[in-house]
Amino acid sequence: MAFIAKSFYDLSAISLDGEKVDFNTFRGRAVLIENVASLUGTTTRDFTQLNELQCRFPRRLVVLGFPCNQFGHQENCQNEEILNSLKYVRPGSGYQPTFTLVQKCEVNGQNEHPVFAYLKDKLPYPYDDPFSLMTDPKLIIWSPVRRSDVAWNFEKFLIGPEGEPFRRYSRTFPTINIEPDIKRLLKVAI
């Protein structure tokens, strides 16, 4: 089991361009973390909605995408290929993320990234779908399997401006529909 940080602000990740992303710099801002994949059926919808949310709250929201290949091998690109895959394949049409993508990682199992160990400990299941895990157990390629595991690509975690994990959303919850919760956390008129 991965080490579980004491605070959200103790965590970090490495961006696709190799820079350390220190979560301590996010104090006072809401943070949306989503495990992503460039070859999933909802890639276009979710990536464009992540861009939209980042553009709507440019100074008060941090969006972080964590590419992961644990679900249907739908992120089989190497780190250096991910941006080109997004630009030319899916979503395509010159798409460029306006948010930070970090290096590919595992979100479940023995080698899960510390960010996901922390978030799953604090938010053990999506509020909108607390009962689903994997639809097909043959697709589980990690061990150990836990009830709190991320079930598929594009699960989302929203963290408040004080660093408290607020809510976890399932893969079926449209990313753009998180906006009212972001406004609530940021105390913006809805």
From Swiss-Prot:
- Annotated Gene Ontology cellular component terms: cytosol
Q: Which BP terms does GO give this entry?
A: response to oxidative stress
> Entry's PANTHER family?
GLUTATHIONE PEROXIDASE, GLUTATHIONE PEROXIDASE 2
Per the UniProt entry, the Enzyme Commission number(s) are 1.11.1.9, 1.11.1.12
Question: Active-site residues?
Answer: U40
Record's protein name: Glutathione peroxidase 2
Instruction: Say what the protein does.
Output: Catalyzes the reduction of hydroperoxides in a glutathione-dependent manner thus regulating cellular redox homeostasis. Can reduce small soluble hydroperoxides such as H2O2, cumene hydroperoxide and tert-butyl hydroperoxide, as well as several fatty acid-derived hydroperoxides. Cannot reduce phosphatidycholine hydroperoxide.
Q: Does the keyword Transport apply?
A: no
What Pfam families does this protein map onto? GSHPx
Which species expresses this protein natively? Answer: Pongo pygmaeus (Bornean orangutan)
The gene name on file is: GPX2
Query: Which principal EC class is assigned to this enzyme?
Result: oxidoreductase
